[in-house]
Amino acid sequence: VLSDKDKTNVKATWSKVGDHASDYVAEALERMFFSFPTTKTYFPHFDLSHGSGQVKGHGKKVGEALTQAVGHLDDLPSALSALSDLHAHKLRVDPVNFKLLSHCLLVTLSSHQPTEFTPEVHASLDKFLSNVSTVLTSKYR
């Protein structure tokens, strides 16, 4: 459960991310594909090379979903219901991959915002991304 302070940290950090969300998520996806090659199996039709338009496009989708989630911190299940259905029933993504992408996104955010990425902010963002992952995998059961 996100505390009020966690929510404040997440909203403040995401407001600083702003228009860079798509780029940061695309960078995190590249980092995930490089660091955890098995994650590539879900994207056999993608050009996964550095700077790929397809990876950037997916980064945009994920970035928009995270922005939507930040705007609905008190009701993530409703805000992400359609994405949860998509990932559970159509795409059948292994739930561990959400954790891997979350980790890579935290690394990416910390590299772009080192001053703002305090241990407290790190913990808040980690909780937020964990909550998003939990919601996205909730319909697997």
Swiss-Prot record:
The modification N6-acetyllysine is found at residue 16. InterPro entries: Globin, Globin-like_sf, Globin/Proto, Hemoglobin_a-typ, Hemoglobin_oxygen_transport, Hemoglobin_pi. Residues 1-141 form the Globin domain. The modification Phosphothreonine is found at residues 8, 108, 134, 137. The modification Phosphotyrosine is found at residue 24. Heme b binds at residue 87. The modification N6-succinyllysine is found at residues 7, 11, 16, 40. The modification Phosphoserine is found at residues 3, 35, 49, 102, 124, 138. Red blood cells. One of its GO terms (molecular function) is iron ion binding. One of its GO terms (biological process) is hydrogen peroxide catabolic process. One of its GO terms (cellular component) is haptoglobin-hemoglobin complex. It comes from the Eukaryota. O2 binds at residue 58. Keywords: Acetylation, Heme, Iron, Metal-binding, Oxygen transport, Phosphoprotein, Transport. Involved in oxygen transport from the lung to the various peripheral tissues. Heterotetramer of two alpha chains and two beta chains. Belongs to the globin family. This is Hemoglobin subunit alpha. It comes from Elephas maximus (Indian elephant). The gene is HBA.
